[in-house]
Amino acid sequence: MISDIEFALSEHNFQFAYKDLQKINLYIKRILLLNTRFNLISNSNSNFNSILNLHVIDSLLGLSTVKEINPSEVLDVGSGAGFPGIILAIFDTSRKYYLLERSKKKSTFLKMIKLELDLENVKILEYEIEKEKKKYEFITIRAFRSMNEYALILKNLLKGGGLIMAYKGKFDRINLEVNQIKNLFSKIEVKSLNSKLRVDRNLVLLYR
């Protein structure tokens, strides 16, 4: 399994150490083992290669943007099984990642993974987003919901000049969603991702 992870990371030109491969391997195995108990991901994608490509690699496609902006802290909203927050934290150990997850089941899983993978740069926040008072430079979200469902509440959690990085799919759908929220932000940028996954993947950057 580690060879599959190494191939996938190399195919996308990601830099990694062997310990990163070990952590990803253990992480995926834990998801497979505990998925039914914690309701982490769709059963249709609950095999090793699907998790690796559709979740791990997809999450890593945003890492270069995080490093380019270089915030001191990142808030990952609705972390679920830990995508993208856990993955970004594994490969970006010098930065603090806050993973916000309201589900007790999923946050329990995240706390287990944090300890097992020894992720000292991760903190799990188990509550509704409306209860968060801290302001952040950088917020990530990887959700199937339309951006107009969360744009305003996330904007209010941004520091001045901060941004939201939303993982999104097809460009046509993005255009429709952007038109609904364009007046909320000073600038909106869409970045096409260089994915080998044969699916349309884009990042939408929403600047306060």
Swiss-Prot record:
Q: Which Pfam families match?
A: GidB
Q: Spell out the InterPro entries in the cross-references.
A: rRNA_ssu_MeTfrase_G, SAM-dependent_MTases_sf
Q: Respond yes or no to whether keyword rRNA processing is given for this record.
A: yes
Sorted keywords for this record are: Cytoplasm, Methyltransferase, rRNA processing, S-adenosyl-L-methionine, Transferase
User: Which EC number applies?
Assistant: 2.1.1.-
Q: Please give the superkingdom of this protein's source.
A: Bacteria
- Principal subcellular localization: cytoplasm
Q: Which cysteines are joined by disulfide bonds?
A: none
Tell me yes or no: is Cytoplasm among this UniProt entry's keywords.
yes
Question: Which Gene Ontology terms of cellular component type are present?
Answer: cytosol
* SUPFAM superfamilies with a match to the protein in the record: S-adenosyl-L-methionine-dependent methyltransferases (SSF53335)
This entry's Gene Ontology molecular function terms read: rRNA (guanine-N7-)-methyltransferase activity
Q: Which residues bind S-adenosyl-L-methionine?
A: 78, 83, 101-103, 129-130, 142
Q: Where does this one sit in the cell?
A: Cytoplasm
Q: Which NCBIfam families match?
A: rsmG_gidB (TIGR00138)
User: What does the record give as the function of this protein?
Assistant: Specifically methylates the N7 position of a guanine in 16S rRNA.
Q: Its family?
A: Belongs to the methyltransferase superfamily. RNA methyltransferase RsmG family.
Q: Under which name does UniProt file this protein?
A: Ribosomal RNA small subunit methyltransferase G
